[in-house]
């Protein structure tokens, strides 16, 4: 029997829809050839509507499901990529979960890495002593992105320790400058840190006027703002043995932390802690891998800095002393054209130099491996887990042993006690090992102070005295030899006069140590021996960077300036005067200026004499006053000339003059400061306390600036 009904499956319907546009279906003419399924859809539009709606919903569900899976995968990928960042500027906040554990934050301000080393050593020992607490060590610059975040985070801290180095003339280190400015110069917040308990350890040198200023100021400010001081501020003195100062301070800290971090029923006695000798994982290579060569001096960073210096060629060099001199002073010019480097008058340049070849030869002999040994150092295990906690210095690029000893190893400084323990651990002679351990022990404190510190014995001399100590390369570079640091110089030029050059004025360091060794300054010797581009196709170059300074001329050129800089202390003032000459030539009105310069003898070491006279002749400098210490029957220094010009100096100060001092911090700068105090007291008819306040106000207002070392 025949029937008019047609049996249509769901697949037939779907096929018809997929092969024909919906608009075409709704407008099809009966004359067109249609499949049975299509005819049914056209004749039953209600079915068509229901079916298409169902299909649309199904397609929508599929799209949403695919999108969510894609988004989830992308989020996971982004999270993994974020974790790959080597040095994140902002802390990952997954530690904010309240798990009931007590947290201790360790913050450090470091210039050469010493404060960071102490902070991380403190962290490692504390982790062993207090296993139930969570410790983290953070660079002060990485702790917060801005002032608001500093405040937000400090409000949450309950226990913190600060390791703060004082740099230059009582200044914070580069990575602590932003924190220090916020914490000491901000609005008075009252006692807003009552929740915080803290300790501070400072790193400084007692020979300098502002000994440990940064640590002392931060310690006082914390207490003023309500925080509870756990122990007195530790005053580490690099002029003696800072490690002993650190140890003594820690012995005051542990009893306090015992009360805070140990359980009440914990009556156990802490096991004596012995720090592990740090060691890199070392991989030896048959030959240099060109893909692993050090390209750091091509930089690749937008702004060169201490971690990312830029290669700069030596463009020009000349000796500034006359042949009659028994000393040396080098004028050297770095070519910074097309390097991305720029600077302002008064800035500093940091220069990375290599150890002298004779020093490297001696170091290679004492290490006991071939100079062409090619290797790389790693701060992680083969499976990627970190080695030695948080204390290992950052690895340097793969290179030969000779290059590593030349570029990265400070082998001429006196070894720290931790280095002696590293040598002892790898001394095959038991007597030598015991002797090294004794020197590093509390019992050997006096002998260490005499045999190493006072005698200025270098690491190489100590290794020579203990020939059986042959540490492996991983130990030598991680625990024994400190990293060679950049040398900083006041730039002696102005970009307004020499845009593509950085000028440096450097006195040669050449002196005999108490044990008779001739010590040659690493960077000053390199500069003296440098070969400029104008003299050879094989010329000298160095990785350099610019460090911003607050040593600036007044923004108003009409403000008077007083400059005091004997010897190489003249360097930044040469830049000042170049800038003033440039302004003068452009028609700018200048305020009066006086320069106090000092040297031994006009015929021997009167550096830049012709230039200084020209500055006077052109009006860039109003008056040049020179003190010669070896010409007359009596020695005359810049402070004596200041006294002779006391009335003029006072008049300039009352007119709003800026006063600048550059040079030796331990001697000259102290003498000039005392002389200035006397001038203010006598010329201003003030008592001693008011004169001291006047000078302090000059400093606070930025009118008395010092660039001293």
Swiss-Prot record:
UniProt binding sites for NADP(+): 327, 568, 629-630, 635-639, 671
PROSITE patterns: FAD_FR, FLAVODOXIN_LIKE
Keyword Oxidoreductase attributed: yes
Positions in coiled-coil regions: none
Stored Pfam families: FAD_binding_1, Flavodoxin_1, NAD_binding_1
Residues of the Flavodoxin-like domain: 104-254
Annotated PANTHER family: NADPH--CYTOCHROME P450 REDUCTASE, NITRIC OXIDE SYNTHASE-RELATED
Protein name as it appears in the record: NADPH--cytochrome P450 reductase 2
Organism of derivation: Artemisia annua
């Amino acid at each position: 029997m025949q029937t008019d009904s047609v049996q249509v499956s769901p697949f037939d319907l779907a096929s018809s829809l997929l092969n024909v546009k919906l608009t075409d279906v709704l407008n099809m003419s009966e004359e067109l050839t249609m499949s049975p399924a299509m005819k049914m859809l056209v004749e039953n539009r209600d079915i068509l509507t229901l079916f298409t709606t169902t299909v649309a919903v199904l397609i929508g569900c599929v799209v949403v499901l695919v999108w969510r899976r894609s988004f989830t995968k992308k989020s996971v990928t982004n999270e993994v990529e974020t974790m790959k960042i080597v040095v994140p500027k902002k802390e990952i906040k997954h530690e904010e979960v309240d798990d009931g554990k007590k947290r201790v934050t360790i913050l450090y301000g470091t210039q050469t890495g010493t404060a960071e080393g102490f902070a991380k050593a403190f962290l490692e020992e504390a982790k062993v002593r207090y296993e139930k607490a969570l410790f983290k060590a953070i660079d002060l610059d990485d702790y917060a992105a801005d002032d608001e975040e500093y405040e937000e985070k400090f409000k949450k801290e309950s226990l913190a320790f600060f390791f703060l180095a004082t740099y230059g003339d009582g200044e914070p280190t580069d990575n602590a400058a932003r924190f220090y400015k916020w914490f000491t110069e901000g609005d008075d917040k009252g006692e807003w840190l009552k929740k915080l308990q803290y300790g501070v350890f400072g790193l400084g040198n007692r020979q300098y006027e502002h000994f440990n200023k940064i640590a002392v100021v931060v310690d006082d400010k914390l207490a003023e703002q309500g925080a509870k001081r756990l122990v007195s501020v530790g005053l580490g003195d690099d002029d003696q043995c800072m490690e002993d100062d650190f140890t003594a301070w820690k012995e005051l800290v542990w009893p306090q932390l015992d009360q805070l971090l140990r359980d009440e029923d914990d009556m156990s006695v802490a096991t004596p802690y012995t720090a592990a000798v740090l060691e890199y994982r070392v991989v030896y290579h048959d030959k240099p891998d060109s893909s692993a060569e050090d390209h750091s001096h091509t930089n690749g960073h937008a702004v060169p800095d201490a971690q990312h210096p830029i290669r700069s060629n030596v463009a020009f060099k000349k000796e500034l002393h006359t042949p009659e001199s028994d000393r040396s002073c080098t004028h050297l010019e770095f070519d910074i054209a097309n390097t991305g480097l720029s600077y302002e008058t008064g800035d500093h340049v940091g220069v990375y130099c290599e150890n002298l070849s004779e020093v490297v030869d001696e170091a290679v002999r004492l290490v006991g491996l071939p100079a062409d040994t090619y290797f790389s150092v790693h701060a992680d295990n083969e499976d990627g887990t970190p080695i030695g906690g948080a204390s290992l210095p950052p690895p340097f690029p793969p290179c030969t042993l000779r290059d590593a000893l030349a570029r990265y190893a400070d082998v001429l400084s006196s070894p720290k006690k931790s280095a002696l323990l590293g040598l002892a651990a790898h001394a095959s002679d038991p007597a030598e090992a015991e002797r090294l351990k004794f020197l590093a022990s509390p019992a050997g404190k006096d002998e260490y102070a005499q045999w190493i510190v006072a005698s200025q014995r270098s690491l190489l001399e100590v290794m020579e005295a203990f020939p059986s100590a042959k540490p492996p390369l991983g130990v030598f570079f991680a625990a024994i030899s400190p990293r060679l640091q950049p040398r900083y110089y006041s730039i002696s030029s102005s970009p307004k006069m020499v845009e593509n050059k950085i000028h440096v004025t450097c006195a040669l360091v050449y002196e005999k140590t108490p044990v008779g060794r001739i010590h040659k300054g690493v960077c000053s010797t390199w500069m003296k021996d440098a070969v400029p581009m104008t003299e050879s196709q094989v010329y000298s170059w160095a990785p350099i960077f610019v460090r911003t300074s607050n040593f600036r001329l007044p923004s108003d050129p009409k403000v008077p300036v007083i400059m005091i800089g004997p010897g190489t202390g003249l360097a930044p003032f040469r830049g000042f005067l170049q800038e003033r000459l440039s302004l003068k030539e452009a028609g700018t009105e200048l305020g009066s200026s006086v320069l106090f310069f000092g040297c031994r003898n006009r015929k021997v070491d009167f550096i830049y004499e012709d230039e200084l006279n020209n500055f006077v002749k052109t009006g860039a400098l109003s008056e040049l006053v020179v003190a010669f210490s070896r010409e007359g029957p009596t020695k005359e220094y810049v402070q004596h000339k200041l006294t002779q010009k006391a009335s003029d100096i006072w008049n300039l100060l009352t007119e709003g003059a800026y006063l600048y001092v550059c040079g030796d911090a331990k001697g000259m700068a102290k003498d000039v400061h005392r002389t200035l105090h006397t001038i203010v007291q006598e010329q201003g008819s003030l008592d001693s306390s008011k004169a001291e306040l006047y000078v302090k106000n000059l400093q606070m207002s930025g009118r008395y600036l010092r660039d001293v070392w």
